[in-house]
Amino acid sequence: MTAKLPNEGKKSPKFLECVHEFFNDWKIKTVESHIMTKEQDETFSKGLKLPHLPDMVFAQNLLSITKNNSSISFCPFDALKNVNDHEDLVHVAGAKEWLEARKESAHLHNIVHPYDWTFSPINYRGTLDASISVSPTEDKIDYEKLKIQEKILFYKDVVLYEDELDDNGCSKLSVKIRAMPSGFFCLQRFYLRVDNTLIRVIDTRLYCSTDKPDEILREYSERECSIKELIDKSVPVSAWTDQNEIPSHLTLKMEATEKLTFPSK
């Protein structure tokens, strides 16, 4: 189903909405607003089982891609629904060492029950309307084609949520899109860095070409390495905080490619 924003009807004056109509009836919509209000925080908390939300949640932020009234959307609420709300912290990779080094953290003492404190939205590939069919495919996104310089018809980069993990790292989910004459490319990226412990990147990529205007290729991947592994591989420290460079240095843990077919008129 299309992503629903809590308190969607109560938009702030500081609210930016952009719509771009594209080839073959595609419509790209982005919404950007401020960090969520106390009222929105309460609404999120009621709809989620997490004992703690990221420090910065942009409740109304959204990116959606629509054709013939069917959409795939990306929003913070649906992403946070994919965060593990019951896993014991010590069972999360690297968490035992992280907790041991930070016994005095006030935030950790306030945890009511175990959950994924990194806010990793595992397997969140976007929110799909039921009318869109999904099937596995051997097709791959043509990245060489994407390297060809073209006129950018539309570009947006939207942050969904972010947390500094008590100043011990960074957890950030964002989604960006660019449209060109040959098609459009969208990347949702979750970047996680837990100092002295690990780095994780979870990507969802969407690509639609004018050659196949009724379908989207969707690639989902999870990559991760411990800090020790990065040091052993001599990955420069400067790359650890570079969200564009670091994925190529991480170990691929999971990958899947699907074809999304949108209904015709």
Where are these regions (language model features)?
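A composition-driven surface/loop motif
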Residues: T2-H20, N24-K27, E32-S33, R223, ...
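Short, basic/low-complexity N-terminal boundary segments at the transition from targeting/disordered tails
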Residues: L5-H52, I65, D167-L173
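Acidic, low-complexity, intrinsically disordered interaction modules
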Residues: Q40-D142, L146-Y155, V159-N244
